[in-house]
C-alpha cells in the first residue's frame, strides 16, 4: 500500500507541545474543527433551545427498547491526543450507535455541512466503541428529532472498524497538526 505523504499514517502523530503531556479534546470540538466545510456558521435556524434539546433526547431514548444505553462515555488516544465524549445512545443487541439531533422546521433545508459534522461525530464515536468493545463493525445512525412534530428521521450506515479507525486518526491528525502550529505561533508571539 502506498501512502500519501500528508496522510496521518505517513506523517505519524503531529507533535503537540510539550510532547510528554496529554491534550484532551471533546468529540464534538474535534469534529467541529476537522469536519467544517463551506459556511462556518453551524446554526440551523430556528433551532431548539437547550432545554428543548434535552427534552427531545429524552423522548427519543425513551422510545428505545430494554437494554438501550444513553450517554455512553467513550474515549480513545492518538499520540498525545485524548479524545472523549458521550455517545447519545447505544443498542448493544443491534450494535447500533445513535447520534441524536433535535431540530425544528424542514430537515430538507438543513445545510449539508451540518450533516457532515453530525456524521463525523457518529463515525468518531463508532471508532471509539469498536475499539472499546472489540467490534469489527457497528451500525451508525443519525436520529433527527423534530421538536414540533415529535417525529424522528433516521439516516443509517454500517461502519467497518478499520475504516472508522482510519477516519478517527485522520481527524486527530488534522487537529494535532493545527494544535502544534498554534502552539508554535503563540510561543513565538509571547
Model-derived features: positions:
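Short acidic (Asp/Glu) and glycine-rich catalytic loops that position anionic groups and cofactors
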Residues: 35-41, 102-104, 148
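Conserved catalytic cores of phosphodiester-cleaving nucleases, focusing on short active-site segments
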Residues: 85-111, 125
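Metal-dependent nuclease catalytic cores in nucleic-acid-processing enzymes
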Residues: 58-64, 113-142
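Metal-dependent nuclease catalytic cores that hydrolyze phosphodiester bonds in DNA/RNA
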Residues: 1-95, 120
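Charge-dense, low-complexity intrinsically disordered segments
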Residues: 47, 112, 158, 162
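Short, solvent-exposed loop/turn segments that connect beta-strands within catalytic domains
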Residues: 78-80, 110, 133-134, 150
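Short beta-strand segments enriched in hydrophobic/aromatic residues
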Residues: 74, 129, 144-146
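ATP-dependent helicase/translocase motor core
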Residues: 102, 134-190
Amino acid at each position: 500500500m502506498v501512502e500519501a505523504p500528508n496522510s496521518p499514517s505517513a506523517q505519524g502523530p503531529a507533535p503537540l507541545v510539550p510532547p510528554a503531556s496529554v491534550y484532551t479534546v471533546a468529540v464534538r470540538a474535534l469534529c467541529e474543527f476537522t469536519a467544517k466545510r463551506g459556511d462556518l456558521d453551524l446554526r440551523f435556524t430556528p433551532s431548539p433551545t437547550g432545554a428543548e434539546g434535552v427534552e427531545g433526547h429524552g423522548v427519543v431514548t425513551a422510545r428505545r427498547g430494554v437494554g438501550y444505553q444513553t450517554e455512553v462515555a467513550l474515549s480513545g488516544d492518538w499520540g498525545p491526543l485524548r479524545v472523549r465524549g458521550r455517545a447519545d445512545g447505544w443498542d448493544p443487541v443491534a450494535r447500533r450507535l445513535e447520534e441524536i439531533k433535535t431540530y425544528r422546521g424542514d430537515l430538507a433545508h438543513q445545510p449539508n455541512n451540518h450533516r457532515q459534522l453530525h456524521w463525523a461525530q457518529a463515525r468518531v464515536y463508532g471508532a471509539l466503541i469498536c475499539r472499546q468493545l472489540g467490534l469489527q463493525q457497528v451500525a451508525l445512525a443519525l436520529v433527527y428529532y423534530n421538536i414540533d412534530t415529535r417525529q424522528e428521521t433516521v439516516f443509517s450506515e454500517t461502519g467497518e472498524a478499520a475504516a472508522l479507525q482510519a477516519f478517527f486518526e485522520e481527524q486527530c491528525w488534522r487537529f494535532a497538526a493545527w494544535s502544534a502550529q498554534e502552539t508554535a505561533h503563540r510561543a513565538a508571539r509571547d
